[in-house]
């Protein structure tokens, strides 16, 4: 069985775009692969964080992923900072990565140009090696990523090839070269207010996204005010009708009906009826998730699952870390 690793940033409540584009697929992947889902809190502190809020977001995100259907019997879900091998591996990887490689990373270039090099943390430059460590520690064969993160996977692959070539003995590879697993087509959900840009939880216009924890009345209001067009005809056309096309994608993901079935069902009907029904479909989708989320937050079950997840993750990560330490010559002697 192949292994999948995915890191999840604890940076606010996911949107239905995150659910449709990633979380929903994770639930399916756990049935076919050996999955590790890691809440990457060490990555979060590359920018300033309020400690209490960060801890709250870590538990909240873990509860939400379990509430949508991640099964701790099938997948390992854990907190990055609770497995110290991540930081140790990150240092070994930094020492085998050039400054030039890191300065070419898009996120560092964008933020350092925006804020000036003196205004960003060193962690923003060096976090890609930590991300490489996240992946290689679990011998990941596949990493699900969006188009915006393919660059990090290329860095990971380049590093692993270089590390194995430099340190492997008798052609025995030390680390596994991961493959990119691109999300399925059609899973990109757009803003409700600007349907040509991706839905984002950091959107300053809160009407542009639906949070996984939005109340039913809020969901109905946001969908009612979603931007469409003046024709009133429900059809799928990304170029000319991006608004209604986006709503059709959401409706399809929420109900399991195909876009074609939905277009046929609403033939001759207006946007008002369509939006009202879509809102109820989204409410029905999120309601059981929200109930389970609240149960987990209020119980000891969540912490028990995360404790066990960290323990299972350590068993695998520490073995890989020891291979890396042995390879580069750390410690007084080779350990197994």
From Swiss-Prot:
* Record's GO cellular component terms: cytosol
Q: Which PROSITE patterns match?
A: AA_TRNA_LIGASE_I
Which cysteine residues pair off into disulfide bonds? none
Report the superkingdom from the record: Bacteria
Question: A GO BP term, please?
Answer: tryptophanyl-tRNA aminoacylation
* Residues reported to bind ATP: 9-11, 17-18, 146-148, 189, 198-202
Q: Which UniProt keywords apply?
A: Aminoacyl-tRNA synthetase, ATP-binding, Cytoplasm, Ligase, Nucleotide-binding, Protein biosynthesis
List, alphabetically, the Gene3D superfamilies matched: HUPs (3.40.50.620), Tyrosyl-Transfer RNA Synthetase (1.10.240.10)
- Hey, what's the signal peptide range on this chain? none
Q: Where does L-tryptophan bind?
A: 134
The UniProt entry, under Pfam families, shows: tRNA-synt_1b
What the entry lists under InterPro entries is as follows: aa-tRNA-synth_I_CS (IPR001412), aa-tRNA-synth_Ic (IPR002305), Rossmann-like_a/b/a_fold (IPR014729), Trp-tRNA-ligase (IPR002306), Trp-tRNA-ligase_bac-type (IPR024109), Trp-tRNA_synthetase (IPR050203)
Subcellular compartments: Cytoplasm
Q: Which family does it belong to?
A: Belongs to the class-I aminoacyl-tRNA synthetase family.
Summary of the function given for this chain in its UniProt record: Catalyzes the attachment of tryptophan to tRNA(Trp).
**Quaternary assembly:** Homodimer.
Q: What is the name listed in the Swiss-Prot or TrEMBL entry for this protein? A: Tryptophan--tRNA ligase
In the UniProt record, the gene name given for this protein reads trpS
